[in-house]
Amino acid sequence: MARYDLVERLNVTFRELEHALMEMRDGLADCRLLAARVFSLPEVEKGKEHDPLLTISVTQKIGKEAQEAALRHFTHLFIQQQSEKRSSKAAVRLPGAVCFSVDDAQHEALHALADKINALKTQLEEIITVESGLPSTQRFEWVHRYLPGLITLNAYRRLTVLDNPATLRFGWANKHIIKNLTRDDVLAMLERGLKAPRAVGGLTKEQWHARLTQEYNDIAALPQKARLKIKRPVKVQPVARVWYAQNQRQVQYACPSPLIVLCHETRGGAVPDIGELLNYDAENVQHRYKPQAEELVMMIPRLHLYLAP
């Protein structure tokens, strides 16, 4: 019964999200467009999700064409809405911004709707990743049994609504996911793998068990207070650096989707200056400031697990 209730909540939450996104699309379409600039990125083909991205060619859309692309993007939730060659495991990214003139009622309604949408997205992600109780390897099959073709990364992605920015500049960010762990944390993680042996990456169960045992012994030999961390690179991401003139501050936002910019003209909101997103070339990245990296010792390459001094 509990599993049935969870599936019911999954479906109800998704339908509410789908309806709210269409309401947002229609609400924005009713507003007066001031400016729009979005940047299409190349499709990620099936089987190439984990290939390193050394270059990214950007195609720009402006004005009405950009607005239409942005509104389609916000409701792009299923693989049936895209090319058969495009991977369903890679989220579709469309950095940029769409700027609308709004009055008091529109401003309040759009902010309230965005808050509702983002709450539903969080709720949907919680149902799938936590309440289902399923490991990541089994979630895909479970979700697609009830919502065939759903691109979960697109469904989870939150909307970003900005008020009266002065300028928007776009660029690329190279980041790492860093998670600090204790020795006992890692040992517990490896123990779970030892208790459920399986064939992985061309290795037999016995070979995989032997590898896990060696990894366990290497970690167990460290002092109990050893500082361990997972430092895993993530693919280069588009970002927006937004300047707010009224309070003289700059804020950086992740920008996988178009920023929704509301210009409240009666409150001094003018059309912002929207910059360009240039092509990405890994060999020509220039860092404004690159702090000295901490010297780390690799412990388990497959986990990106390091020993910190």
UniProtKB/Swiss-Prot annotation:
It holds the Pfam family Ter. GO terms for molecular function: DNA binding. GO terms for biological process: DNA replication termination. It comes from the Bacteria. Its main location: cytoplasm. The keyword Ribonucleoprotein does not apply. GO terms for cellular component: cytoplasm. Keywords: Cytoplasm, DNA replication, DNA-binding. It is found in: Cytoplasm. HAMAP family: Rep_term_Tus. Belongs to the Tus family. Trans-acting protein required for termination of DNA replication. Binds to DNA replication terminator sequences (terA to terF) to prevent the passage of replication forks. The termination efficiency will be affected by the affinity of this protein for the terminator sequence. This is DNA replication terminus site-binding protein. The lineage of its organism: Bacteria, Pseudomonadati, Pseudomonadota, Gammaproteobacteria, Enterobacterales.
